[in-house]
Regions:
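Positively charged, small/polar-rich N-terminal and surface patches that mediate targeting and assembly
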Residues: 1-107
């Protein structure tokens, strides 16, 4: 079983919570952490930008990433939301078993 940590930023905590709750209700993530605020620096429309944002760290299964990503894009207010998946290389067996039980059935 291959699990991912999915990183996403949002403009504010309210939007982050809305997206996280939807992901949980649809069983696309097992859990999430919201870090508020973070300072983000980026290129946008030819200029360097800086914003206070909210960082969301979600735990999921790699086979759910396409659904998760599509759903985040539907719910997110940004034109180009950050949605990045990093593989979980290892974890405690009991935690990974708990994650498996929380997620929609994966193949």
């Amino acid at each position: 079983m291959s699990y991912n940590i999915v990183l996403m930023t949002a403009p504010n905590k309210e939007e982050a919570v809305k997206i996280v709750r939807t992901m949980l209700e649809e069983r696309l993530i097992a859990c999430a952490n919201i870090m508020d605020p973070v300072s983000s620096f980026f290129w946008w429309q030819g200029k360097i930008g800086e914003e206070k944002e909210v960082l969301v760290i979600m735990k999921s299964h790699e086979t759910l990433f396409k659904k998760l990503s599509k759903r985040v894009i539907e719910l997110h207010s940004y034109d180009t939301p950050e949605i990045l998946a990093l593989p979980i290389v290892n974890g405690s067996p009991s935690y990974l078993d708990w994650m498996k039980a929380c997620l929609e059935p994966v193949k």
